[in-house]
Amino acid sequence: MLKKLTRMHRAYWLLLVAVAALFTQSAYVFSGKDDESSSIKRWKKGAGWGWIWGEEDEVGSLNAMTPESVSSAMKIATRGNVYDLGITYSRRSFKWPGHSPGEIMSYRSPEGEKRQLDHDFIAPDVNKIATGWHSCALFINDNVATQIDGLGHITAGDDHHWYNGFREGDWGGDFGLRKCDATTIPPIVARGVMLDVAGLKGVDQLDAHYAITPEDVEAVLKRQKTKLMPGDVVLFRTGTLRHWGDDGSNVDVLKKYDTAGITLETAKLLVEQYGAMLIGSDTSGLEVAPAPEGSPTFIPVHNYLLVEQGVHIGEFHYLEDLARDKVYEFCYMATVNKIAGTTAGFTLRPIAIR
């Protein structure tokens, strides 16, 4: 990370400070309730979060953010160093096999416009300096590249219910989700903690299918001299994204290492004992694959976090620069695409500020 920020970085930093100040002054609480009812007190040690925010809630544990928690997170950013946690997506990028391929196609181009002349405003006698434009049409899955899973992403049971009891028979649709879609994920500003498990093990990346245990979490915290607090965004580094390169087209290598991840026991530790508000990693699925023998589902961590606890999952977060600089605590900021019906925020560019 550059020690001296460019003018653009400084301007961006000042903008973020201004936004955070506005956030605090507005006393905006995501649950729509007062500070007391939406405070971290709603989390219960030993139980975690769960369906505690009311029968119409679509936000989950992110309700715990308050102006006070945002202000506290902003105070971590004392150096002004901005870390880009997003990865570049292209039509060749690696993705989980359960998601559709994508295409990025030129829709309009200066040469095409000149030949087609299908708009009056580009006729030569009107468009005398030959102004042209580029635009693209995208066919893309809503779970690719850097992501934050929405609470409607995963369903459970014969009734196909998701977080807070919303059911497919009531709230599914031909044009995406009608409850808990990605538009319900609020802007996230929180204390972030990176747990460098690859660093703990002294390897570039964890072995394929490595299961990150509660013991690993405690060992990393001790090694990094880091503490977890209720309301944290917790991100695990496996080292997988060191192989992403320019656009994630090194599919065979990524597919191999993308299988390392956390166990259900680790997820429960973070939620029920530490109060994690969002849990993520540098892989496509956060949890170890395949699921441990005896698991009732192929993705037990997703089921527990999204459906049972209402805790969003961050995926494909680029953590290599944070690991290089040994930055384990930071202010985490992320916003998602406000596309109605989508099941996740995708191709995101969250940032960590220290």
Regions found by a protein language model. Name each.
Residues V29-R354:
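Active-/binding-site microenvironments in catalytic and ligand-binding cores
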Residues M1-M8:
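N-terminal secretory signal peptides that target proteins for export/translocation
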Residues W13-Q25:
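Bacterial N-terminal signal peptides
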